[in-house]
Amino acid sequence: MVVLNPMTLGIYLQLFFLSIVSQPTFINSVLPISAALPSLDQKKRGGHKACCLLTPPPPPLFPPPFFRGGRSPLLSPDMKNLMLELETSQSPCMQGSLGSPGPPGPQGPPGLPGKTGPKGEKGELGRPGRKGRPGPPGVPGMPGPIGWPGPEGPRGEKGDLGMMGLPGSRGPMGSKGYPGSRGEKGSRGEKGDLGPKGEKGFPGFPGMLGQKGEMGPKGEPGIAGHRGPTGRPGKRGKQGQKGDSGVMGPPGKPGPSGQPGRPGPPGPPPAGQLIMGPKGERGFPGPPGRCLCGPTMNVNNPSYGESVYGPSSPRVPVIFVVNNQEELERLNTQNAIAFRRDQRSLYFKDSLGWLPIQLTPFYPVDYTADQHGTCGDGLLQPGEECDDGNSDVGDDCIRCHRAYCGDGHRHEGVEDCDGSDFGYLTCETYLPGSYGDLQCTQYCYIDSTPCRYFT
């Protein structure tokens, strides 16, 4: 079956309609209008103008569809046939006489819509329209809350035994069990070969403090280190107890012989004649005499064994000679005098310790005065311990001799004081807010105990 295009079908319908209208016999049999309208032959005879007044064919019942693309090549032969028929139908028509006007023809189809005119004014509010049709069903709603659980149903029958599952993972480690009984002691193994010496291990952690051991022998004196900072003066200590009296020293040398006494009074006259006999031998030496070491002995002076200043005054039994500070500290004799060879000075022992007797000597006794001007020339010569070429008494060389504690000159950077040389320090500057006089210890440290604060 041949399927025709809608446009081609419309054209065929028009041609079919025209062919039917052109047959007068068919029209008369269907619509008897011969009385009302003259036939085509009558119009041809009536005048030559009748042919020219033929009405155009009616418009098609179905308007052709609108095609945006080009025309189909199938329509070209039909259109050519239509044009040929129209030319053949109009070519023999001769202009005839004007006939009577015919009846009005049927109303044609509505024309194409015109252009949209300008927007008119807003009309009155119309009546409310009818109720529209129900819309499409809406989207299903969200599920509601879970309802209460229903009653528990009857228990079902036991199902068939399932297949054995895979082995599970290893469980956690259990708790440690109780220790077992101690086994029997094994036999002693053979002694193995001596292994190679291992590397030295790291030093271990310090152990616990052990008990204090016995005091070992005194070592050799070490090198003098740097002097530390001066500490704050401590509080005055309590008065110590008086020590035991020392051992009686050896007796002194016998003193010089005394002056001969005055001659006694003459004896009674002898009964007979006095004859001078020969001189006798020299007698044995007498005991050593007593030395009071004081003023001339008389009846007002005390006898030997008593102090010149009374029985309560202390006495100095003997003078010791030491080489250095260590030997001086070993002497425990109370109220004694010692001579230090290294410093060439005397020290006295009382309740406070060993104190120098010569506080501010200009120079030791064996210091020789420079008579030739050789000391201070910077050249070390016989008899000089040092020669720094200056006259500064605050360094380690004073008048060509080494400085030491007790020479009366403060060695800067080494000694806090020396004798009465405090380096321009007083109680006011050493302890602000105090007053009094500073003291210098036998070790050339400042003693601020005499300083007092205002109350």
Curated annotation (Swiss-Prot):
Residues 1-22 form the signal peptide. Residues 130-133, 235-238 are annotated as: Heparan sulfate proteoglycan binding. Residues 96-269, 277-291 form the Collagen-like domain. Its main location: other. One of its GO terms (biological process) is acetylcholine catabolic process in synaptic cleft. Homotrimer. Component of the asymmetric form of AChE, a disulfide-bonded oligomer composed of the collagenic subunits (Q) and a variable number of asymmetric catalytic subunits (T). The N-terminal of a collagenic subunit (Q) associates with the C-terminal of a catalytic subunit (T). This is Acetylcholinesterase collagenic tail peptide. It comes from Homo sapiens. The gene is COLQ.
